[in-house]
């Protein structure tokens, strides 16, 4: 069963989505979004997992599926953070 996770990569990518298998260096996410920027008030990437994107965060559009390579961490996402990720507006510059 897919669970909500925040994934970081060696290339400094930060992604939210739903994963079945998070073992190994590669992770596939569905209904995924990336975090382009987060403000200091987010408290780092762990804050993105515990609280979701704060005001001022820049969140990319949702994609159906993404395969991430060279994964450095997988963090469980709280239900409150899931709601914030799902509600975040798409940053368009």
Range-by-range predicted roles:
Residues 1-93:
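Conserved RNA-binding domains used in RNP assembly and mRNA/RNA metabolism
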